[in-house]
Amino acid sequence: QTQQFTNDPRVPGIGFAWLMGRRNGRRVVMHGGDLWEFSTQLLLAPDENLGLFVSGNSSGAAPLADELVKALFDTFFPPLEAAEASGAVQPAGGASALGVADMAGDPRELAGVYRTTRRPLTTADKAVSLLTQFRVAARDDGTLTLAFPPGYGMPMATWTPAGPGLYRDTAGDDIMAFDHWKAVAGKARPSRMYIGTWAFERVPVYETASFTLATVAVIAVVFVWAVMAWVFGRRVSGLAAVLGLVNLAAIAGIAGSLLAIPGWELTTAVPQMTRAALALPPAGAVLAPALVWQNIRRIAAEKRRQRWTFYSRRTTRGLTAIVLPWLVIAADGAFIWLLHTWN
């Protein structure tokens, strides 16, 4: 079994259906598969006449398999010396000749949120990638930390510099490489990250889980404000309140349906309840232009009744009545954009 492809010459690649790699400096070929709360791993060490098959269920199956393989190799096949581990990636120069900063550059350039390139792009399950984002952070000592998505059940990993744009897992033989550098906010940052045979891409800020959740929260607050302003004091028109209520129902329906079903169903199809909730935002998109027209007519009517200034409008109708309808329109547009972003 020989390597046929690699994402980057500095990291292990893939042969004919087998993933190439190293454990404690020893050559291994492996393959695995994971579904929701199920994990299987087959590993062969040809030079050691070793074969291992592990399969398990529940959310802890994947880390359990990794721990078992690590314990087995640490016990029966301890780490080789660097000179013996032929084929292992070595820095271009010893640590004595190259300082950590020279070997790795500025680790802060590598920090960010990444996601695997094996993901849906044009269907609604693209949103599942919100749950599978990896966060890379830089430490003051020049090392990197890799935080796995919450559902993976994997502990945070620490990576030490092993060359320019190259890092090694402190708990194993995995190599992390960064490539495809692009200018972001005036600084050169990598757009790709490779760990073994896995390829990752840097996530744009507007598609990170934190940005998406914060945006949904702000949008929901505006819609709740509109409904409450109409219920208590009629400080906005009924049209603004209805638009807010329709979108709140959509947000609650989408979130509720995704939380109510078993997680594994998300990997097969979009739930019917979610589809029903997604039918509400288009209705809101129809109401939004009507609200714009209503606001314009109201402003025109006030201009005819009196000499119009912002102060006069603020004192006769109140700031909420002036600003909130436009915020509702903006929030509706942001909600439609968000749904379009995630198909």
State where each predicted segment sits.
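Catalytic loop of the DD-peptidase/beta-lactamase superfamily, centered on the K-T-G motif
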Residues: Q1-V231
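Alpha-helical transmembrane segments forming the membrane-embedded cores
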Residues: L213, A229-N343
